Amino acid sequence: DLYFAYQEPDNKAFAHNFMVLAPSGLKTSIIPSLRTIQEFDPSWVIPEPAASNLRRMLKFEMLDENRSANKSNRTKNPNVQKIAVHEPLADLFGLVAVTNAEKVILDRIDKSTDGLFDFHDESEDEKDRVANELRNKIGKLPHLSILIDEVHHVASSNSDDEAKLRTVVNRWAANGSITTVLGFSGTPYLDKKEKVEVTAKHQITMTEMSNIAYYYPLANGIGNFLKVPKVISTGSNVRSEIVEKGIRSFFDTYKDTVYSNGTCAKIGIYCGTIETLETEVYPLVSQLCQEYGINPSEAILKFHEGNKQYPEPQGARAEFATLDKPFSKRRVVLLVQIGKEGWDCKSLTGIILSQEKDCPKKMVLQTSCRCLREVANARQETALIYLNAQNYKYLDEQLQKQQHITIEQFQQGRKQEE
């Protein structure tokens, strides 16, 4: 968009600025992942020297501030200030802003008695004013493309979020500033079947989102920009047996693996519940680490939100955010209700799903793929996926239904085309 917009600045077909929206429920894993947009290399798409020229034009803002900035002279909304620094907005070119859709864009919008949404435009309430201030400022961004990540969360939502978002975008579009609205999803499926009317007497139902415009096959990414996976089903459904086999296989293969960027190979274990993590998985993994000469206190990261019996592990949130840094010495990441989608940890080299409910049934494929992002060269990098018999079956079913490939083809990726 930026390349062609630079050639034809008055052509409304091409965006000058971009707003990336992430779902609220996934902010812990999604927002940090979206920060990697800053590392994108324009030469992946555009040849030099145009690529370097585009990189110099890019401006990146994370609109992630939740509290008012009391000392600001321009605004009491720090997210508005991040946009205001780029004024005059009419001439703005190359802004990429990332924000949490529900918490920021959809904040302080209520449904009135007539079923319409009330933006409280005339309200004197400070929170209403602050929320509208940001929406109004975004609405002034010229030639804006809106990119909605994990869009299936909006489409499948039982709340009014999708309708709210459409209402907000329509408001912006009324100003003539919206170029495109694009949604992205690795799992474009609805929670409930959608009825599509074909004629007055005929309709079809589908669980797949009906407005998919472009599809990129997973198999094309394997060995291209995704690690080559090895999928193993233990044939057992005993958690301890599966975890032990998975950890032993991981340490036997990747114990000494340090990637070219200085990060060490890691494995994620999805535990289902906090109690399972604390009482079953952690003691077992700790014992195995000691057996392999690895210090458990340095190697194991427990990450969950805590409960009455087991509080959230101190410092875990910060450590989770820095797992992909060379200074992180964590090798095993124990997870409860996080990291199933959108988690960007390139040094994650394996995952274990030892029980059926360690992740939702419909997300076995997506969770299994968490360990596939390449570090430097996907052709030379491998990953380990350890599953119990039931999750192996779910993975096979989802690959065939969603990607039209078998587990064997999944493990071959681009090799099957060569």
Identify the function of each model-found stretch.
Residues 1-12, 33:
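Walker A/P-loop NTP-binding motif
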Residues 103-106, 113-176:
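SF2 helicase catalytic motif II
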Residues 306-407:
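Conserved RecA-like P-loop NTPase helicase motor core
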Residues 45-76, 80-81, 90-95, 107-109, ...:
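Conserved C-terminal RecA-like helicase domain
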Residues 166-289, 413:
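Interdomain helical connector at the RecA1-RecA2 junction of SF1/SF2 helicase-like NTPases
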Residues 154-157, 190-191, 374:
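Catalytic P-loop NTPase motifs of RecA-like helicase/translocase cores
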Residues 12-58, 100-103, 271-278:
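Conserved Walker A/P-loop ATP-binding site and its immediately adjacent core
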Residues 97-100, 146-148, 179-186, 334:
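Structural recognition of the conserved hydrophobic beta-strand(s) that form the central parallel beta-sheet
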